[in-house]
């Protein structure tokens, strides 16, 4: 059974104050979101990891990945206005990916997790 994890990180961190959304706040030299990504990669390196980020955060995330030399394979889907919309967008992205992949059939397991919760 193929496994996927949608990591939803669309928040703006307004309640935290400051200019940096909480998913990008450094924790021991890496953004919180990177710790979450690494946690799921350690759990199952064959699981497909999909980050759901607002479009305007995606260039910043890609820059961070280059800066810290991210080795965890993942894809990015566009976030939505609310968590509900972000999860929906991630599931639609995944459905298209599975539908377009040749030879894939059978059951899949999809987990949805908040990007700012790295301690799973």
Where are the predicted features?
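Acidic helix N-cap motif at the loop->helix transition within catalytic regions
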Residues: 59-64
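A structural signal for short coil/turn segments at secondary-structure junctions
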Residues: 43-44, 69, 98
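Conserved donor nucleotide-binding strand/loop of the catalytic core
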Residues: 69-81
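Conserved beta-loop-beta/alpha segment of the NTase-like Rossmann-fold superfamily
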Residues: 82-120
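Hydrophobic C-terminal alpha-helix "anchor/cap" residues
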Residues: 40-41, 65, 94
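Structural motif
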Residues: 27, 52, 77-78, 113
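N-terminal glycine-rich phosphate-binding loop and ensuing alpha1 helix
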Residues: 2-58
């Amino acid at each position: 059974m193929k496994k996927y994890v949608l990591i939803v990180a669309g928040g703006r961190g307004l309640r935290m104050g400051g200019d940096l959304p909480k998913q990008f706040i450094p924790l021991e030299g890496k953004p919180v979101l990177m710790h979450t990504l690494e946690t799921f990669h350690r759990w199952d390196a064959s699981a497909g990891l999909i980050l759901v980020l607002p479009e305007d955060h995606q260039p910043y995330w890609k820059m961070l990945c280059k800066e810290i030399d991210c080795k965890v394979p993942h894809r990015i889907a566009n976030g939505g206005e609310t968590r509900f919309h972000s999860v929906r967008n991630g599931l639609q992205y995944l459905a298209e990916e599975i539908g377009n992949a040749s030879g894939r059939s059978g059951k899949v397991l999809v987990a949805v997790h908040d990007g700012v919760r790295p301690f799973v």
